[in-house]
Amino acid sequence: MRIVVALGGNALLKRGERMTIEAQRTNVRIAAVALADLARDHQIIIAHGNGPQVGLLALQSASYAPELPTPLDVLGAETEGMIGYLIEQELMNAMPPGTRIATLLSRVEVDVNDPAFTSPTKPIGPVYTAEEAKIVRAEHLWSMVSESTGGLRRVVPSPAPLAILGLDAIRLLVDAQITVICAGGGGIPVVRGETGKMEGVEAVIDKDRTSALLAQMLAADALLMLTDVAGVFRDFGTPDQALIAHITPPELDQMVFEAGSMGPKIAAACAFVRAGGALAGIGRLSDARAIFEGRAGTRVLADAKNKQHKKQAKTMSKPTSMSIGVAVTD
């Protein structure tokens, strides 16, 4: 099957972990094992988050006083190259000899009038204590938001993806059975200027929403959003919290989720399934195969497809012509 897999930034860099290349390489190596296992039986397309990484680069850039800070679109491109390289190398090491993998920079068009530009919600960078956040906010005039796990993070605009530029090149590689890593960090945000030419813009697109669009455009059978939590919970953070094993978009419409974390994943899952996708899964990176097969995580399915897809996933034991896209959370 064809699966788009979205890897969260927090799956590549654990919460509270120092943002060193070695730490990220170690985490990517672990991720590569899970992805290689999934790729044994399916075709995967990999997207990834960049929240911690792009935030760190922005902080480093802002600290270099002689020059103006590097804009977020350029920093996003930097993270696509950096993280894509790490994933490609470790995945190549984890997969059979002869496996073909390609990492592509992806520009994604957004609307210059998207309301997200006046209401930032996307957390990026490190988690600050209240005192640290006070200093950073005063120095850089950044918007900050409290994390559910404690501390504060910078938030930036996260406009909706309208179109993935260069999609034909991605499709060409996918159809040639090449494992593609693309749409990193949600893609490089660009807008159409007054002259009709594309221009970069200060934003970080949510990678889950871009991954859902990518999965739709590639006619993927499944979208997996892999992060550092077990899935979607009812009554999260209370003594009564319980993992939701499977649910439909209409049921999710009745629930409320945090705008900067689980909310985008829910929106992406619902959008993909409503567009005809068979399955959208949310859960831990280490449970990638189990989520797809219905043994872990949360699975979002259309009513009529629930039983049918569960049966298909359980009986699937050898490679098929379908592809899978993986999105990594941030």
Walk through the language-model features, giving the residues of each.
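C-terminal catalytic "cap/lid" subdomain
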Residues: 1-330
